[in-house]
From Swiss-Prot:
Keyword hit for Nucleotide-binding: yes
Source species of the chain: Bacillus subtilis (strain 168)
Record flagged with keyword Nucleotide-binding: yes
Protein's name in the database: 5-oxoprolinase subunit B
Keywords in alphabetical order: ATP-binding, Hydrolase, Nucleotide-binding, Protein kinase inhibitor, Sporulation
Gene that this polypeptide is encoded by: pxpB
PANTHER family: 5-OXOPROLINASE SUBUNIT B
Residue numbers binding ATP: G194, W195, Q196, L197, I198, G199, K200, T201
Main enzyme class: hydrolase
Subunit structure: Forms a complex composed of PxpA, PxpB and PxpC. Interacts with PxpC (KipA). Interaction with PxpC prevents the inhibitory action of PxpB (KipI). Interacts with KinA. Two PxpB monomers bind via their C-domains at a conserved proline in the KinA dimerization and histidine-phosphotransfer (DHp) domain.
Any one GO MF annotation of this record: 5-oxoprolinase (ATP-hydrolyzing) activity
C-alpha cells in the first residue's frame, strides 16, 4: 500500500513519523503496522517504537548507528531515515498486525459508575442501553498515555458520547471506566480527571512490579464484559 508520511528529527536519537492529522482507525492501523514492521526488521542501533494516535516515534542509539553509516551518508539521522523509508515502502497491502484481544470485566453504575445516568440522559437512553452499547463494542488501543498504562480507546459508538465533566474530580479511583467525547478509557491509577465515570474494573491495568508493567499495549483490541458487584469483589479478592 502507499503510505503517506512526514519524518521529523527529534534531538539526536529519535525521529517522529507523522501519518496525518485525523484520528481514526485507518490511520492508527497504519501507525501500528509501521511499528510492528520496523520492530520485525530492525536497523542497526534500533531501540524501540512508540506509537501514538497518528504518529510513530522511533528511538535509536546514535553511536551504534554511526558505526554502521553507509557510504555517502554523514549523519545517524539520515541513515535511520533511509532505513525507515525503505521499511515503510515494503509494508504490503495485506500486512496485518497481530492484535491481542483483552477482555476487561466491568461493574457498571451505582458507586462504581456515578455518571452512568448522566451519560444516559445526555444521549436520551436508559442506563441499561448505555451499558449494552458499551459492552457490545470492540475498542482499539490507539495509544497509552496521560497516566501509566492509561489506554486511549477508539471505536466507541457515537450513541453514548458525552463531554468531559465541567469540573474535574480531584481524585478518581484506579480501575474507573470513563467516557470523554467519542473515547472511552480506564484509569489505571488514582488521579484527578474529568471523564464521565460509568463503571469500574477490578483488574489492575498498571502493575509496576511486573514486566511489562501495563496490562494493555498499543494496538490491542479491548472488549468490556459486564459483571455484578458480587463478581467484582470476588475478582478483587482473587487478585489480593
Amino acid at each position: 500500500m502507499t503510505v503517506r508520511y512526514q519524518i521529523e528529527q527529534l534531538g539526536d536519537s529519535a525521529m517522529m513519523i507523522r501519518f496525518g492529522e485525523e484520528i481514526n482507525e485507518q490511520v492508527n492501523g497504519i501507525v501500528h503496522a509501521a511499528a510492528a514492521y520496523i520492530e520485525e526488521q530492525p536497523f542497526p542501533g534500533f531501540i524501540e517504537c512508540i506509537p501514538a494516535f497518528t504518529s510513530l516515534t522511533v528511538f535509536y542509539d546514535m553511536y551504534e548507528v554511526y558505526k554502521h553509516l553507509p557510504q555517502g551518508i554523514s549523519s545517524p539521522f539520515e541513515s535511520v531515515k533511509r532505513d525507515v523509508e525503505e521499511r515503510l515502502a515494503e509494508i504490503a497491502e495485506d500486512y496485518e498486525v497481530n492484535r491481542r484481544i483483552v477482555e476487561i470485566p466491568v461493574c457498571y453504575g451505582g458507586e462504581f459508575g456515578p455518571d452512568l445516568e448522566e451519560v444516559a440522559k445526555i444521549n436520551q437512553l436508559s442506563p441499561e442501553e448505555v451499558i449494552d452499547i458499551h459492552t457490545n463494542g470492540e475498542y482499539v488501543v490507539y495509544m497509552l498515555g496521560f497516566a501509566p498504562g492509561f489506554p486511549f480507546l477508539g471505536g466507541m459508538s457515537k450513541r453514548i458520547a458525552a463531554p468531559r465533566k465541567s469540573s474535574p474530580r480531584p481524585s478518581i479511583p484506579a480501575g474507573s471506566v470513563g467516557i470523554a467525547g467519542l473515547q472511552t478509557g480506564v484509569y489505571p491509577i488514582s488521579t484527578p480527571g474529568g471523564w464521565q465515570l460509568i463503571g469500574k474494573t477490578p483488574l489492575a491495568l498498571f502493575r509496576p512490579q511486573e514486566n511489562p508493567p501495563t496490562l494493555l499495549r498499543a494496538g490491542d483490541i479491548v472488549k468490556f464484559v459486564r459483571i455484578s458487584e458480587k463478581d467484582y469483589h470476588a475478582y478483587k479478592e482473587e487478585s489480593n
